[in-house]
Structure formats: C-alpha cells, structure tokens
Amino acid sequence: MAALRSFLKKRSSVLCNGGAVRHRLFSAQVSQPIPDSPSFAQRIGNLPKDLPATQIKTQVSQLIGRTPIVYLNKVTEGCGAFIAVKQEMFQPTASIKDRPALSMINDAEEKGLITPGETTLIEPTSGNMGISMAFMAAMKGYKMVLTMPSYTSLERRVCMRCFGADLILTDPTKGMGGTVKKAYDLLESTPNAFMLQQFSNPANTKVHFETTGPEIWEDTNGQVDIFVMGIGSGGTVSGVGQYLKSKNPNVQIYGVEPAESNVLNGGKPGPHSITGNGVGFKPDILDMDMMERVIEVRSEDAVNMARQLALKEGLMVGISSGANTVAAMELAKKPENKGKLIVTVHASFGERYLSSVLFQDLRQEAENMQPVAVD
C-alpha cells in the first residue's frame, strides 16, 4: 500500500504540473480575443453543404438512420426460419422515433406551418416519440409540451425534461385516448401552438417508406420474405410494408398488438405493459389492407423475451422489442416459413426501462446490495 501511495503521489504531481502549464497556455490564448472573429455557429453556417475531405456531420440530426441488422442466434431454437432484427437503438436518442420526429418537423417547416422560436409544439406520446420530438425541438429551437399516460417509465420522463420539454401526465385508466384528448385541449388554449399529430401525419409513414424500408431491402439484398412490426402510430409497419411490397408483392407484412388491448383484432382497449404499442384505437395512417394479420402478444411474454434477449443475445432492448421478437418467432416456427428470412425491429434501448416491470426484480436486487469489506 505504501508503494501504491508513493506512485499515486508522483503521478498526481506530474498531472498537476502539466495541468498548470496547460492552464497558463490556454489562459493566455483566451486573454487575447481576435477582433470580429466569427462565432462557431457562424462558421458552421458558412460551411459548404458537401465536405469531400471529411465525414464530420454538421448537426446531430444527420446521424439518424442507417441502423444495422443482426441475426438472432440463441433465442430462436426450434425456429425453421431465420430472424434478423433492425437495431434502432443506434439512433441518437436510442429509438426508432427519431426518424418520424425529424420527418414531421421538417415537413411542417417546409409548409410554413411552424417557426423556431415562435411556435409551441404540443404532442401526445407514450414515451419514445416524445423523447425524439423533445430532442428535435431542442436542436431546432422550439418549445415542446408533451402529454403522456402516467404509467410511462421514469427514465422517459427524465429524458424529455433533459431536452427541455414540459410534461403533463394523464390518468392511466384513460389510456392514450385520454392523453390525446388532453393534448387537443392544450392546443386550443395555447397561443401559436401546433400539433404534429403522429397518428394521422403522412410524414410519419413517408419517412419509413423512404428510409427504413429501403435500408431493410438493401441490407437483406432483397431476400426478405416477411416483415413483422408492433403497431403504435402505425407509421413503421405501414411505411416499411408499402416499400417492401413495392419491391416484391410477395413479401408478407404482419402487425403486432398487445393481447390485453387487441383493438385491431376487434377487441377492447385495456391496460398492458407493451409501452408504445396498443394505443387503444386504429390510427389514421395505419394501412391494414396490406397486412396478412395482426399478431397478438401477451405483455408477460413480451417482457420475458426482452429479458432473454439481453441474457442470450446481448441485446438490451425494450418491451415492444420483446413483443416483436415473440411474434417473429411464432411465424418462424410455422412449417410453411421454413428457410425464409423474417425481419423485425428492436425499436429502443432497454436502459430506458429500468424503472418498468421489465427490470423491477433486478432493480430491487441492485437497491438492496450491500458493500463488502476491503482490507
């Protein structure tokens, strides 16, 4: 221990002395400002649109898209088909909703419907879309107000507040219907307010037709046979489905909804744990005609699969991603699908669900851990 303390003391002295030198040099530079020098923002604005000598992006929104696809290997035991999953956790805010958030805001700006610094954006959300919208609003300079059911995870609320959004929680028993109603009430009472309306905005579907669908087609070399996706706003399954069908009419498209809130299969809305899916009504942009059917997945099965994906595949994902995987495996086990390529999506990163039912046992275990003695 004495030798270790001596080493650390010498190391600290070197670092401190070096830090002092760097501080003096840096301070000298700062004390002599260059007259009329342009700000960083001005320099960025003056950059040419294409910089062939560098791959540096000029803004974070340019990082959206081009996410990887990976095969599942261990949880697929007993499946006759191959399952590949597009990992949307690699988006800037770790969810697929970055795509439509960017698309809808850009579309509204191009149409002259909203203006940074003047317009207040209001939107109902179950979480991930709200985070993505708050992220885009912060980057572009909009005030953002979000309504959401109170059952959404604490992590999602913190993420939204991190980007400066105002949150209004609604009665969980009213589901997304109550959240949407509250958003419309705020829209009517707030000056210069605008709602992007993710459930009816064609730009939501368009971005998946123009980006997500082509990415899947290209990464699979056009070999995708089946695409399966959970239904929230319906933008992803509709946009991707329409694109894949345009390339190959024989590609089969399946939706996914919670068994406890199977509205799209003629059932009634109800409470469930698959956050982001099963909004309790049929969204306007949802294209049901191109789908073979909507697969029902129980919340318990979705949660268990999400846990297995982390333990067996090294993929820490959210509950809706677990539901998508359950549905994909159901299709992969059918004899008629043997040898086919099924593609689905892991829509968000699992760290966003630490306070949810997904990790409640592990959270309690971690909270109860005690330190061990160290000699």
UniProtKB/Swiss-Prot annotation:
Cofactor(s) this protein cannot do without: pyridoxal 5'-phosphate
Biological process according to GO: cysteine biosynthetic process from serine; fruit ripening, climacteric
Keywords: Amino-acid biosynthesis, Cysteine biosynthesis, Lyase, Mitochondrion, Pyridoxal phosphate, Transferase, Transit peptide
EC number: 4.4.1.9
Disulfide bonds: none
Tissue distribution of the protein: Expressed in leaves, flowers and fruits.
CDD domains xref list: CBS_like (cd01561)
Catalysis performed (reactions): hydrogen cyanide + L-cysteine = 3-cyano-L-alanine + hydrogen sulfide + H(+)
Organelle targeting sequence: 1-25
A Gene Ontology molecular function term of the record: cysteine synthase activity
Protein name, UniProt field: L-3-cyanoalanine synthase 2, mitochondrial
Provenance organism: Malus domestica (Apple)
Gene: CAS2
